[in-house]
């Protein structure tokens, strides 16, 4: 199986829009190819999502006081045949379902406390890390449970070979802002998801005076940089929460505090994306689709 996640947003004039659904469609094709499933044309994927948002328009909420309520869409494809054994699917089911959702942070944005996972890996090079499939998320659950028992909100995974290179959280991409104005994020090397929110942030970064940099990030470099103030702001990003500030890292028994846990630049990036999605700012890149 493979799946996607995107949202339908109601604007002030009552119109309903999707944010970069073509990017989700392209990633859906990539995921299908990796798992030997039939590929659905991007246009058909987008039309299905637009059609559901139109049919279920009464379920697309007003933004509300938080300014973040929306209809979450879940397109998915599963093997659908009577067969017992190992083999690629000859019959599949593609469907899109939706559910109204509120703000990810009901009582305001709160910084995350991350458990640094140096042993268990979420994915490995040559595996399915770039595909959006359930197995990747299932592989993160044991570490998520461990994180909760340690009082953490989420897990920061490193690579499966050297156990040192930062990859991503259980369901979000990772980014850090350096004091000299670089927006640093792990490079795409086949083990992390090609996040649409990640891509969008990298594209708007220059508008905020930031230099986007995709490269390998050593976990010890990050933690040392957080301690010294070299990385004063750190955050995670994804469709559900958009941008989530990170306040601290728990590495073994050592806690490392972020200098600016809800930093000005992090929150400005978050506001920029939300304003585009909800029509409060001009969409000069043509990201919205109705």
Language-model features and meaning:
Residues 195-200:
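Feature captures the catalytic cores and cofactor-binding loops of soluble hydro-lyases/lyases
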């Amino acid at each position: 199986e493979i799946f996607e996640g995107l949202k339908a947003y109601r604007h002030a004039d009552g119109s309903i829009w999707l944010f970069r659904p073509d990017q989700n469609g392209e990633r859906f094709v990539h995921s299908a190819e990796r798992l030997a499933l039939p590929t659905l044309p991007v246009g058909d994927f987008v039309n299905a999502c637009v059609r559901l948002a139109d049919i279920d328009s009464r379920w697309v909420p007003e933004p509300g006081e938080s300014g973040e309520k929306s209809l979450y869409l879940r397109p998915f494809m599963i093997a659908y045949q009577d067969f017992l054994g190992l083999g690629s699917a000859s019959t599949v089911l593609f469907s899109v379902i939706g559910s109204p959702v509120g703000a990810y942070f009901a009582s305001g944005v709160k910084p995350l406390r991350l458990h640094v996972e140096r042993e268990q890996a979420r994915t490995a090079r040559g595996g399915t890390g770039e595909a959006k499939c359930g197995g990747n998320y299932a592989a993160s659950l044991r570490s998520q449970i461990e994180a909760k028992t340690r009082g953490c909100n989420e897990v920061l995974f490193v690579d499966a070979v050297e156990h040192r290179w930062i990859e991503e959280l259980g369901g979000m991409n990772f980014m850090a802002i350096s004091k000299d104005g670089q927006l640093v994020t792990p490079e795409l090397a086949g083990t992390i998801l090609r996040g649409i929110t990640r891509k969008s942030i990298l594209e708007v970064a220059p508008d905020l005076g930031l230099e986007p940099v995709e490269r390998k990030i050593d976990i010890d470099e990050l933690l040392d940089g957080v301690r010294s103030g070299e990385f004063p702001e750190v955050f995670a990003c994804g469709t559900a929460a958009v941008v989530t500030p990170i306040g601290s890292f728990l590495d073994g028994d050592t806690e490392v505090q972020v200098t600016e846990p809800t930093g000005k630049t992090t929150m400005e990036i978050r506001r920029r994306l939300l304003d585009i999605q909800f029509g409060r700012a001009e969409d000069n890149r043509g990201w919205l689709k109705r």
